[in-house]
Curated annotation (Swiss-Prot):
The keyword Phosphoprotein does not apply. GO terms for cellular component: plasma membrane. NCBIfam families: PRK02251.2-2. This is Cell division protein CrgA. Involved in cell division. The chain crosses the membrane at residues 14-34, 45-65. Keywords: Cell cycle, Cell division, Cell membrane, Membrane, Transmembrane, Transmembrane helix. It is a multi-pass membrane protein. It comes from Tropheryma whipplei (strain Twist). The keyword Cell wall biogenesis/degradation does not apply. Belongs to the CrgA family. InterPro entries: CrgA (IPR009619). It holds the Pfam family CrgA.
Amino acid sequence: MSRKKHESSENNPVWFPTIMFGLMGTGAVWMVLFYISNGALPLPAVGTWNILIAFGIIMAGFAMMSRWK
């Protein structure tokens, strides 16, 4: 018996890990900027909600990680 492999259809596109790691990195940088600048960056108008925004961006990257093959 021969098995058919469809590796190209099962693997993620090349851009997938780039976006995934980019989201996690962006969220981490967002949080570091918030703490280093004492809330003056990246969005001073939203205050401590910047932490939730950063976690949301990081979690989007982790959600993509669950689909990575």
